Every structure is written in C-alpha cells, then in structure tokens.
Amino acid sequence: MHEAQSHLLSVRNLKIEATSYPPGEPPKRITIVDDVSFDLAKGKVLGLIGESGAGKSTIGLAALGYGRGGAEITGGEVKLDGTDILQLGKSGIRKLRGARVCYVAQSAAAAFNPAHKLGDQVIEATVKHRLMSKEDARERALYLFQVLGLPNPETFGDRFPHQVSGGQLQRAMTAMALCSKPDLIVFDEPTTALDVTTQIDVLAAIKHAIEETDTAALYITHDLAVVAQISDDIMVLRHGKMVEYGPVQQIIEAPRQDYTRALVNVRQAAREEAVDQTEAVLRVDHVSAQYSNGFKVLHDVSLHLCKGQTLAVVGESGSGKSTLARVITGLLAPSSGAITFEGRPLTPLLKSRPRDDLRRIQLIYQMADTAMNPRQTVRDIIGRPLTFYDGLRGSAKTARVKELLDQIEMGTGFIDRYPAELSGGQKQRVAIARALAARPELILCDEPTSALDPLVAEGILKLLMKLQEEQQLSYLFITHDIAIVKAIADSVAVMHRGKLVRFGPKSQALSPPFDDYTDLLLKSVPEMQLGWLEKVLTTRRMESAGN
C-alpha cells in the first residue's frame, strides 16, 4: 500500500467489536472486523465483497465514522484527507456526514419520506449543511438527474417516491448522495434488490456519475460479477477478516485464495435438461387473471410442467411471475382458463379445495423470515403441517421433525431454536422442511434464493436438486436470475407484462432466435469479465441508433 497522504481514505488496522447474547449463555464480546487495512484514492472505487456477516457494511459505515447498532470501533484509524475521523467527536462527525461523506442504502424505498417530493429530499442535506443555496442545490439536482439518466429530469423532482420505479428511486438516492459534492460515497448493495434489466441501468448510471464527479466510492455487494464492472480494486472479506485484496483483474482472473476462487466459480455448471418422458403434473391452459379493480395481470398464459422436473418462470418485477403462482395455489382466482393437476381440474379458490389438494402443492417464499412466526420454534414451524395433514402429535411428530431436519442437512440441534437465532440460509432450509412435511408433489419456489449470498444460495439450490432426485418432486421455480435458470431448469417460461413471451425446453428457450424481451433479459445478466458493462452499453447504443 502507498502512504496514506496520497489517498483520500486510508484505513489502518480497523477493529470493531460487538456484544453477543447467545441463548442460555452469558453475554460475550466478539470481534466482527479484525485488523482490516486499505487505501482509496479520489475518483477510484473499491469493491467490498463477501457473504452476510463478512463485515462489509460494518466497514463501510466505519468509513463514515459510524459504528452500527451494538457495535463499537475499538482499534485502528480511519483517515479522510489525513484526519482521523474516529477522533473528531460527535460534532465533527456530524459536519462530515451528508457533506463530505455520504451513504446509499440497499433499500431506497426505506430511505425516502413518502410524504415529501423527491427533489426536496435530494437537496435537503446539502441545504442543511449550508453548502449551497436552495436555488444552486436545485440546479445541482437537475444536473445529477440528467447524469443519472432519469426520465424527464426537469420535472422528476416534483414526483413522490411511490410515483417512480425501484430503479429510478435508487438513482434518485444516488443523486441525493452526490448533491453535496462529497469526497466519498459508500454504496451498500444498491442493486441487490433490482431485476437484471433494471440493475444494468442503475450500474451504468452510478459508474457514469462517479466518473463525472470524480468521487471516491466503496461499493459493497455479494455479487462478484457486479463489482467487477464498477470497481478498480476488490477486497474479499470473510468473518470480518480480509481474505484477498488487489486490482479487479487479478481478483477475477487469477484469485490466490480458495475462498475467492469459490466466489468466482459459484454456479458455473449448468444442469442438463430432462427429456419430457412423463405426463404433465401441472397444466395451465389459457389462464387470465385480474385484480378486484379490473386491472388485468395475466393474459392468456399456457404452460405445463412434467413430473420430477423443474420449470423456471423468469421475468422482471411486474411480469406476472408471482401472480401466476398465486393463481396456481388458489390465492387468486383466474378470470378465465383452467388449471389441471395430475389430470384433474383444480378448484379456483384455495378455501374450496380439498385438504389433499392443499397438501400436494406447497410454497417456498422469497423471505423465509416473514413467512415464519417469530414466536414459534423450529419444532413448531415444521410440525404444524404434520399435525394439519397427518394428525401427528407428541413423540411421533418430534421424530418426524428430526427426520426432516436431517433431510435438509441441518441436524436435530436446531429443533428448539427460534427464527431470530438462524441465519438467512438456515431459515430457508427450515422453510423447505416445512414444505416437505406435507409430502407434496409440486413445490412453487418463489425466488427462494434471491435474498441470499451466492455461496449460501448455491447450497440451497443443491439441496433442492438432491431432494427432487430422491423424492421425484416437481418444482415451479420463479426467478429473475438467468444463472439460476441455467443451473436448475429443465424447461423455461419467460414472462413480460403479464404475457408468456417464450416457453419450451431450456436448450430451446435460451437459444436464438430470441424475441426482443428475452434477448434483453439474457444480455442484461452480469458476466464475470472485465469491460462487460461497457460492451453491453455500446451494443445497446448501436442497436438504438440502428432503429
């Protein structure tokens, strides 16, 4: 590393501790960031990558002089232009935040006040810090709206948060951070919750804005393909320690550590599709659906899923993927068309279906923790369907719960834990066990890995594939991740604005010629190669000019 004086941000031997409260044990002190050092020059981007709990966000917040809830910075230096901000005190830190150092969170929706216009919120911190007059701040905001590619930049600031898309809201939050002309911005997973087609626009906008304003940035993510497009250097973190640190090309093309190699190689292999030699377990014929206000959300959708196979339903937010799952499960009645399961028509509404039909079709949700009662133990959560469908109680139910915990590779030691005591991956495994408890034939998987880190998600996918092979399960797997589609699917359905635009075996669905939307979707998936983002944007510009 170079001397700190030549860098805007210099972090040395950073140590951060927190107090842990393990169940049934006295509180204990744990180290969550251990001896981390790095430098960041003006106009450069350092990517921080690792799984949940690696310390990425904790380090990012420390660069703002902030110890997250329950955490304390107990050692090291964080120097901004040679000044150790950890020694400034509360008053000095307040003057920095929102002025020289800014933060862009993962959830832009949670960062904006729904009752105020976007333009007023974008300039608020800049005006409060008296860095510009309100008029100059509005001019700066307009310039940033243009740089970030927001629609109708002259009037964009007059909108409220609910009147713009998720991608537009994320760019508005970036404008808020850039408005005060800060020296440093911390981007904390700004594209994780976005669809691939939206993500590429936001990534391009952030990259362009950083270059235009010569701002330094820490870019936090668990997606190595994404960070490769925007960073100059990458730091790989695990359990609060630095695993590897170097130029992006070296990390991507010649990683030195086993853990980094595992991140680079995650989900490289594609599954060979099965041949349709079985009858369709599920058939959707010309199904349309609408909400109570008459808004049509599905338009004449027809597809089928063969027994023991996986049908991936792919598309961006609002495409109708989850609505299709709601119709299949009976949570939303179709306005026309029919759904048959193992050759028999399914009653449109859930409450009218026989209990055995309910048992045979189960759901696994995207956010496992919101689908579980936080006051129930794993024993209760998995045991509920055992009682509901099979009447199991007492020792018989406990024995079956233990069997299911072994099937999901967690072990019986978790049986009396609560959801809050589980990691994200463990919660999703419990959700899988709960679905298996009903002895289903079809499981609808609604983005079950989208909120998980790549290595954890890979473990969940491998578990699902193993269970499918052992129990001849059929999966309808909803996702917007083409890499997952390639890894697990036998057949693919592409949806766009409530319509089915492509359906067939994976080899056919993911091979040209493509319709325009499928082509866009496939080209928007970040690839683990340098310059991929620039190539995609250049291709888009050429195609746009040709049209």
Please name every model-derived segment.
Residues 64, 68, 329:
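Helix-to-loop junction immediately C-terminal to a conserved catalytic motif
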Residues 84, 136-155, 395-413:
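Conserved ABC ATPase "signature" region
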